[in-house]
Design a protein with these regions (language model features):
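Serine-esterase "nucleophile elbow" of acetyl-processing enzymes
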Residues: 10-79, 94-107
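Conserved phosphate-coordination/catalytic loops
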Residues: 56-59, 88-91, 125
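Short clusters of hydrophobic/aromatic residues that line enzyme substrate/ligand-binding pockets
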Residues: 43, 88, 210
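Beta-sandwich interaction modules
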Residues: 2-6
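Conserved long hydrophobic alpha-helices within structured protein cores
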Residues: 1, 36-37, 142-143
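Short substrate-entry loop that stabilizes the transition state in hydrolases
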Residues: 44-46, 85, 117
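Alpha-helical cap/lid subdomain in secreted, periplasmic
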Residues: 64, 92-224, 228-232
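Functional beta-strand-loop-alpha-helix junction segments that form "active/interaction loops"
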Residues: 77-87
């Protein structure tokens, strides 16, 4: 197995269905801009379980983004579970993106869930500084950085029979927005969009979008919904 970031120069094709039959596959290369995704588990690709049910699988919103695109761009998802703005770079994942970047490409950057676990990666110190460095390096390649706020968790506090939404990622989301304004970088406010819907639906109804027993990681329903926030 691999213990570090690596480049996989293969095309994997899955054929599913009852008694599927495939006569041939025709692949035609086209030149279109690429949207690279840099982020954590809430953005990452996941494999499906069998028998498949969209509520039973983990799904990051990055794997569903191309459902909302028209073919004029392509998506390359480099997001990985457990990564922060620091470990994504230190483990070589950002180097792989830089190696492939061309002028006119896009890089969507979404971190925060794992940064907030570390004192040196808080919203007032390492988190925005690491994002600032990434933005500068993307622009040096004549590519276009896009920031995304960390998608909200379905976390509530119950007191005296009353539920109150607990916004655990407020500071990192606001730091991301502030940096975008400072550096003139577009910001996809996934945090606010997800939080608004969670509050509108309520704790229990929102569970349809999350993996069973998990208040952070979405299932495939949630992945498609969150990708819609980004596409909007």
């Amino acid at each position: 197995g691999k213990t570090a970031a690596f480049e996989k120069n293969t095309l994997d094709i899955a054929v599913v269905g009852h008694c599927p039959a495939l006569d041939f596959v025709s692949i035609t290369p086209i030149e279109v801009p690429t949207i690279y995704l840099a982020g954590d588990s809430t953005m990452a690709d996941y494999g499906a379980e069998y028998p498949y049910h969209p509520a039973a699988c983990y799904g990051g919103w990055g794997q569903a983004l191309d459902l909302y695109l028209d073919g004029s761009v392509t998506v390359c998802n480099h997001a990985h579970n457990g990564r922060s703005t620091e470990t994504f770079r230190n483990e070589g994942h950002f180097d792989l993106i830089q190696k492939q970047l061309r002028p006119g490409d896009f890089v969507v950057i979404q971190f925060g869930h794992n940064d907030q676990k570390h004192p040196h990666l808080q919203a007032y110190n390492g988190y925005p500084e690491n994002l600032r460095r990434v933005i500068a390096e993307i622009r040096a390649k004549k590519a276009l950085p896009i920031l995304a706020t960390p998608i909200a968790r379905n976390v509530w506090t119950e007191q005296n029979g009353k539920l109150t939404y607990n916004d655990l990622l407020h500071d990192h989301a606001q730091a991301c927005i502030a940096l975008g304004k400072e550096l003139n970088v577009p910001v996809l406010d996934l945090h606010q969009a997800a939080m608004d819907e969670i509050i509108r639906l309520g704790r229990d109804a929102s569970k349809i979008y999350y993996h069973q027993g998990d208040w952070t990681h979405t299932n495939d329903y949630g992945a498609v919904r969150a990708a819609g926030y980004a596409a909007d």
